[in-house]
């Protein structure tokens, strides 16, 4: 599996697919942690490419991914 992060001089990182633009405090080899505001109306922090919980109140499946902008499917 390829490295999900692209290291830059500032120490921040971006997801290889460019879906995460707010990644920070990420070390090379680690997954970017990004917070998206559009996950069932809640701010959700999850690892890019992995499922995160939208939380209670979601009308539908409560799983979401950073890759899809943390939008419930």
UniProtKB/Swiss-Prot annotation:
Signal peptide span: none
The induction annotation reads: By cadmium.
**Record-annotated residues binding Cd(2+) 5?**
48, 52, 54, 58
Task: Give residues annotated as binding Cd(2+) 4.
Answer: 46, 58, 64, 72
Binding residues for Cd(2+) 3, per the UniProt record?
Answer: 28, 32, 34
UniProt keyword annotations, A-Z? Cadmium, Metal-binding, Metal-thiolate cluster
Q: Which positions are annotated as binding Cd(2+) 2?
A: 20, 26, 39
Q: Where does this protein hold Cd(2+) 1?
A: 15, 20, 34
Q: Which InterPro entries match?
A: Metalthion_mollusc (IPR001008)
Identify the residues that bind Cd(2+) 6.
Answer: 54, 66, 70, 72
Q: Which family does it belong to?
A: Belongs to the metallothionein superfamily. Type 2 family.
| Role noted for this protein | The metallothioneins are involved in the cellular sequestration of toxic metal ions.
> What's the protein called, per UniProt?
Metallothionein
Annotated source species: Dreissena polymorpha (Zebra mussel)
Organismal lineage: Eukaryota, Metazoa, Spiralia, Lophotrochozoa, Mollusca
